A protein has these predicted regions:
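Positively charged, amphipathic and often flexible ligand-engagement surfaces
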Residues: 1-211
Length: 211
């Protein structure tokens, strides 16, 4: 289950690489924190390797700039993750509105789990070419529960919203995803929602390898 920890952009062409740390079911060893690994791909890979050595899974969420070097830096990140032997322990978010279908295909070919982000129309267009990619769904979007039901057999990242209504929608969507045969991921830093997700996973017979 995952808490989204995006990087922050400080320039027009450089990318900072944020990443999140999935929390295994039934164990929250310390409060979740925000991590920004640095401005270079090697920074992200170095810190990711440290977390993997602690027994964690890592989700890298690059925030690329809009310059000509954005695609090159992203390609370098993919190559370095693979060279470092982190493919089995990392998933990589591809901002398809900035980097497009080629970047998503490169990640998939490298053997990394892919999470697609961006405007829904862009994500859906790229998803058709990248089977198995995780599709983000916000719990406070109109019709989120219905869309989660349509996608429940695949890999869905559920994004938590804000407020009591969003929390209730989160739980409804969670019930749909956890009871299906897919691979749900939970994107929140709210320990209460993480605990609920753990309870729902256990109720549906899921172990940490199933989420």
């Amino acid at each position: 289950m995952q808490a989204p920890l995006p990087g922050t952009r400080t320039g027009h062409t450089r990318a900072h690489y944020g990443f999140d740390v999935p929390v295994r079911l039934g164990a929250v060893p310390r409060p979740l924190r925000r991590f920004v690994a640095g401005a270079r791909p090697e920074d992200a890979v170095r810190v990711a390797a440290e977390l993997v050595a602690e027994g964690r899974l890592v989700a890298l969420e690059p925030v690329p700039g809009r310059g000509d070097d954005a695609a090159a830096e992203f390609a370098a990140l993919v190559a370095q993750v693979r060279t470092a032997g982190l493919v089995a322990s990392c998933e990589l978010t591809v901002p398809v509105d900035r980097l497009g279908r080629p970047a998503a295909l490169d990640v998939a070919r490298a053997g990394l789990p892919v999470v697609l982000s961006g405007p829904p129309a862009d994500v859906d267009a790229v998803a058709a070419a990248v089977p198995g990619a995780a599709l983000p769904r916000a719990d406070d979007d109109t019709g989120a529960e219905s869309r989660c039901r349509d996608l429940a057999g695949g890999h869905v990242r559920l994004l938590a919203g804000r407020g009591a209504d969003a929390d209730l929608a989160f739980v409804r969507c969670l019930n749909v995803l956890m009871s299906a045969a897919g691979h749900p991921a939970v994107a929140t830093a709210d320990l209460r929602l993480i605990a609920i997700a753990g309870e729902r996973a256990a109720w549906n017979g899921r172990g940490h390898e199933d989420v």
